[in-house]
């Protein structure tokens, strides 16, 4: 089991997702899988990120609802969650 860490921005992103009416159980299921150290099912389209997010991973909760996280040893840091436009806007 990994030790979870939550960024301040992640906590704000969760509140925004709730306001948008997202199904928070989907997010909770994904977080539980990651904290417990399970390999994610292919449906999450989990993959490493590049550029400014190098070292982080991205998993799809829904087609346009993402989770950005980083695994370091026995800890996992949940950095951001939101739409592509929220997370990767230039």
Give the residues covered by each predicted segment.
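A short, surface-exposed loop/turn module that caps and links secondary-structure elements
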Residues: 33-61
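Enriched for short, Lys/Arg-rich terminal
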Residues: 1-3, 9, 19-25, 60-66, ...
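A general structural signal for well-ordered alpha-helical segments in protein cores
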Residues: 24-27, 46
